Amino acid sequence: MLTTESPTTTTTTTTTTTSSPSSDIRDKFIFGNLEVKVKEVKGCQLHFLNVKCELALKKTEIKTKPLANHTFFDVFSFRVSAATSELEIEAWKKNFLFKDKMTGSLTIPINDLLHANGEAKWYPLSNKKPRSSRVKKENITNSNNKDNNTASPSSPDEAQEKGDEDQHHSADESPAEETSPTTGRPRSVSMPAKKVKAAPEICLEIKFVLNEPPKEVLKGIVLDGVWNSENNFGSLINNPHWIKCTQYLLSIKDEITPITLKLRQPEGTDQRCSFFVINYDPFYNGSKKVILDTTNDIKKVSSFNSPIPATSVDCKIDLEPGQYCIIPYAESFAFSGTYKFNLDSEKLDNCEFYALPKSQEQAWNEITVDGLWTTATNGGGDINILGWTKNPQYSFTLTKKSRACVLLSQDDNDKSVGFYVIKQLDAGKRAIEFREQVGKTESFKFSCSTGCTLTLDEGTYIVIPSTYDHGIEGAFHLTLFTDDKNATFQPLTNAFQEVEQVKGTWVGKSAGGSPNQPTFFNNPQFHLKVPASDKDEVIAVQLIQDSTIADEGIGFIVLSRDSHSEPLTAQDFQNEMVFTKTSNWEKRNDIVCRLHVKPESPREFTIIPSTFDPSVNRSFKLQVYSDVSISLDEIEQKDESSDSEQNDD
């Protein structure tokens, strides 16, 4: 009866390190005590163990014999204070003639230490890598020759012997083979299975007690703040939304004061942050600052515009007497979180620190309008060329004397932009004359935002934004900040309904000069006719000289007389005929005078434009603006030859 014997199976249990759940320990302070109990070592010959953590090194008792298995009763305590700490254990075998030999090692990372709870646990000890033995050159040569001879059998018998060698080990290599005395052929011998050696391991009890990190005590003035989508727009340089960031006012009273500013976030907040220290003008008087020029406004801090962003920021700076605006920011746009802002100084009595605005009454009335430049509506920024009147215009009305700041912003900085602010001269109408400028940007520049501050009386004003070059298309935003809670700001689209234009020339005799010259009445003359009405009418008369350098003074007078069929002469002129005139003869491209025509006023007028000096040859245009139908024609000069013939008769 045949029986089948099952092969014997040997099972080896190997303990491996179980990876603990990963903890995000970045930017955390770790303070705690680590207790390590060494209980037992298996499969590793040693005399003693070295246990290291950070800079501390401790040694177990030294065993008398280097047995593979040892029991220990050592307990070690370590201070853990760094996010890169780890526990290192080394097994050493003493050598009384040579250096001691390390027979095993173990490294436990910080994450495993943080989750250790004092339970006994087996950890594998890694064996020290054996040194590679040197092979003599002749052995390598003999081995190569043997391999060559074996690889190429020259006869069938050798091939057969080669096949036998592939199936069986040589007697020198394996004790499981034996040579038969009769045939000389090897035969198999049953041998017991070789026992697998267990991996070396160590049993440890590790307990980690996490201590609360020492609390930072902020001295001086501490202000609490909140970041959210409404007040955090990242780094504010070249950002048109900077005005919405939280601002603090720091006042240094009467001497240079060294201060320390600290920006702190809650523990564990992984958000880089920083702040700017910016000059604060007395103009703002407790209101938030409208930053117009970061180049000149930002105080340099250690050659940086702001302290280097980090999860917490410290800054030491000496400040002269004055006021400074401090703007904290989180690096991620619209980040939500809390923070503390701390000011400390040896001269704290010389400092004042609070959030802006100082009171609700000092909060800005903020009004924003959106606009668009097109090829047809962008006349450029040169006010000496009448194309500027094509630009968009916006009017704001102040109900009292007020502070105002106008900010022009664009979504990028690829266009050179700026604006002018002038007083509105024609109620409810777009400006036709560049006069009574009250403010402007310092220059046209490639920037995301630019603006100016103003202190203005009650009234209506016009903002004229433009690019430096005409015809460029693009979107823009205009924002008015004012302490007048009843102020209004809106696009200005209304214009005069009627515009009449005639062209003329000053040349030769017709270039008669100003009224101070006896030849004044030789200048071209024009007949303006206004229809009868029971309402007051405002008629704007504009004289434009065809010159871009405005090198000649120009002006005109408006006369009322009985007949306008012929040019007025010096002999017929009377002072009572003067209805109005330009205030002066000015060197400018255009000049405007307004006629206030009442129901009882004359309705027909003679207009005589001129240069200031006589004999100046130049062409010109005369334009009349009105909301009623008007007529404007040149009065023909008398034919002098006909007059002389009539006199001869």
UniProtKB/Swiss-Prot annotation:
Renumbered residue ranges of the record's region Disordered: 1-22, 124-193
Bias (Low complexity) ranges: 140-149
Gene Ontology biological process: proteolysis
InterPro entries with a match to the protein in the record: C2_dom, C2_domain_sf, Calpain_cysteine_protease, Calpain_domain_III, Calpain_III, Calpain_III_sf
Alphabetical list of Pfam families matching this protein: C2 (PF00168), Calpain_III (PF01067)
Residue ranges the record assigns to the propeptide: 1-3
GO molecular function: calcium-dependent cysteine-type endopeptidase activity
CC annotations in GO: cytosol
Residues marked Cleavage (site): 192-193
Post-translational modification: Undergoes autolytic cleavage between Pro-192 and Ala-193.
Region span, Domain III 2: 498-633
Keyword annotations from UniProtKB, A to Z: Autocatalytic cleavage, Cytoplasm, Hydrolase, Protease, Repeat, Thiol protease
Record's keyword annotation contains Repeat: yes
Residues annotated as domain C2: 15-123
Signal peptide: none
Location of this chain's protein in the cell: Cytoplasm, Cytosol
UniProt region (Domain III 1), positions on chain: 458-489
Gene3D superfamilies: 2.60.120.380, C2 domain
Record-listed E.C. numbers: 3.4.22.-
Role according to the record: Has a weak caseinolytic activity.
Protein family (similarity comment): Belongs to the peptidase C2 family.
Protein name (Swiss-Prot/TrEMBL): Putative calpain-like cysteine protease A
